[in-house]
Amino acid sequence: VNKIFHDTDVVHHLAGITDVPRIKSQASSEKDEKIKLVAEEGTQNILDVISKKCKIIMPSTHVVFEGIKEVKKDILENEETKPVLSYGKSKNHNEKQLKDSGKNYVILRLGSVYGYSTDTARIDIMPNFFSKMASQNGTLKLYAGGRQIKSLVPLIDVARCFKFMEEREDISSDIFNLTKDTVTVKEVAEICKKYNPKITLKETNDEVPNLGFSLSNKKILNTGFKFLYALEESIQEMISKWSKQNLIKDLEHVRDGGNEFIDLRGKISNHELTEPINMIGLVESKKGTIRANHYHPQQEQKCLFTKGQIIEIFQDILNPNSPKVTQVVNEG
């Protein structure tokens, strides 16, 4: 730890156990001890080795207020915390560790983080879970009738805020609520039903820890930070991305550009991609030459031929009995 962090300028301290009990009946001494160990000792390990000039930015959680008995809205950063379960208690302890450390810190108390992710989306977060169920035409159970109030925040805005705090040298040794939406569970379910009317909403009397609360975001907005993403559009995206897709199972598929616009200046041809681009390469080949290429089963590659013509020969090398396929690909 010392080797990595001793001369670091900024630390985004995200480490922690996130598979945590949501209600008392889910808790156990073994789980609680693991959550506490990783949170408290892990954080202290970082604080012990970073320099005074290093800025540490740590996500805390709205759950530090889970012990509030009555519905309360617009909770400020300086209100007394009331954690109950191990996760909230560990984050509450982390906040005190940073405040007492004498180091340059920023604490962001996150609402429930929602939004589509290309890698490991947190399905245990209510808006994400509801969107996943809605994408499969499932039933959304509304515990306590869905009356609980939730403070939510978009995933991409959380990432943007971490970068914002990293770059703002004038913000230090401070804590901010990072929430955007205050809604009920039922309102989230109704948005899901708007984008997939096939789902069923079922109200139940199951246990809930409380009827909810919300955090004020006035302080974070006063820094100049702006939220750019919306709950309804995020839910629509998650339902769409997680719904059944008519996927092309061919090893390779050739498709011409679409939505063409042609005039005297030339032609515009469009190719719509369904996923983020993480790399772009340019290949130039001379006439009569040969190139070899490979990609792994979990990858997708998309190639746009802008000039000339190629003859392709390809095969699934994981399957020795697969056929060798030959095809001609033209520009565009």
Language model features with spans:
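Short acidic-glycine-tyrosine-enriched beta hairpin
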Residues: I317-G332
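A short, N-terminal "cap"/entry segment at the start of jelly-roll beta-barrel domains
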Residues: L247-I277, A292
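C-terminal substrate-binding subdomain of Rossmann-fold SDR/epimerase-dehydratase oxidoreductases
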Residues: G138, Y143-D256
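Glycine-rich NAD(P)-binding loop of the Rossmann-fold in SDR/ketoreductase-type enzymes
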Residues: E30-N45, T81, L85, K89-S90
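NAD(P)H-binding glycine-rich loop region in Rossmannoid oxidoreductase-like domains
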Residues: V1-V38
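Conserved Rossmann-fold NAD(P)-dependent oxidoreductase catalytic core, especially the SDR/UDP-sugar
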Residues: H13, Q44-V84
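NAD(P)-dependent short-chain dehydrogenase/reductase
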Residues: K96-K150, L155-A159, F164
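Glycine- and acidic-residue-biased ligand/ion/polar-headgroup-sensing regions
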Residues: Q298-I317
